[in-house]
Design a protein with these regions (language model features):
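Conserved adenine-nucleotide phosphate-binding loops and their immediately adjacent elements
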Residues: 1-23
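Walker A/P-loop nucleotide-binding motif
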Residues: 31-49
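Amphipathic alpha-helical "lid/sensor" segments that cap RecA-like P-loop NTPase cores
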Residues: 42, 47-48, 140, 158-180
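Conserved catalytic segments around the Walker B and adjacent sensor/switch elements
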Residues: 54-68
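Conserved P-loop NTPase "ATPase switch" module shared by AAA+ and STAND
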Residues: 77-102
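Sensor-1/coupling segment of RecA-like P-loop NTPase cores
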Residues: 92, 105-132
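Conserved AAA+ ATPase "sensor/coupling" helix adjacent to the nucleotide-binding pocket
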Residues: 135, 152-163
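Conserved AAA+ ATPase "SRH/arginine-finger" region at the nucleotide-binding site
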Residues: 139-150
Length: 180
């Protein structure tokens, strides 16, 4: 096994947790159910995962800079304790061979009781991952669940010490719909 990329993820003091996504993550964690998060660039996918994991150690790999073979080499040995494993940027897998290899690896990891797998992508569930999704019943969190509620948006503005008028707050909501 190659050297693991183990990260202690840190949180942002200005971050406001989207409760809809938070509740789904808590349920998935309690059952160690694979999670598939997706959303457009800037929708807060990776930040949300970092905040949720807090100071917990995890193995993190982005397919942007880590090959599938290297990610497979990072997979921990079976253990009494569980490992949190995050694979980011799945949308960057371009070749059929990479997608197939990654799909196989995800199936292996999802089947293990000592691994909690979190997958992050810009795209909804891709066709090449549907078999694993059905077999292992992934929890899916889409970008709409990463959006803030009106109350959460107001908390965000307060953290930045911004005090817009009620009219401005409504306008911000109309324009952004809670997009982080």
């Amino acid at each position: 096994m190659s050297d693991k990329k183990t990260h202690k993820l840190v949180t942002d003091e200005y971050y406001v947790r989207p409760q809809a996504a938070w509740e789904k993550m808590k349920a998935a964690r309690s059952m160690r159910q694979t999670v598939y998060l997706y959303g457009t660039t800037g929708s807060g996918k990776t930040t949300f995962v970092m905040d949720f994991l807090g100071r917990r150690r995890c193995c993190y790999a982005s397919v942007a800079d880590t090959g599938i073979d290297e990610i497979a080499g990072m997979m921990p040995e079976k253990s009494e304790t569980y490992t949190i494993f995050v694979i980011d940027d799945l949308h960057l897998l371009e070749t059929e061979d990479d997608r197939s290899a990654c799909g196989h690896l995800i199936e292996k990891m999802s089947a293990r009781t000592d691994v909690w797998l979190i997958l992050i992508s810009r795209a909804p569930m891709p066709k090449w991952l549907k078999t694993a999704f059905v077999r292992y019943i992934f929890v899916t969190i889409g970008e709409e669940e990463l959006c803030l509620s009106q109350k959460e948006q107001e908390q965000y503005l307060e953290k930045w010490e911004l005090m817009p008028t009620a009219v401005t707050v409504r306008r911000i909501w109309e324009l952004g719909q809670g997009n982080p």
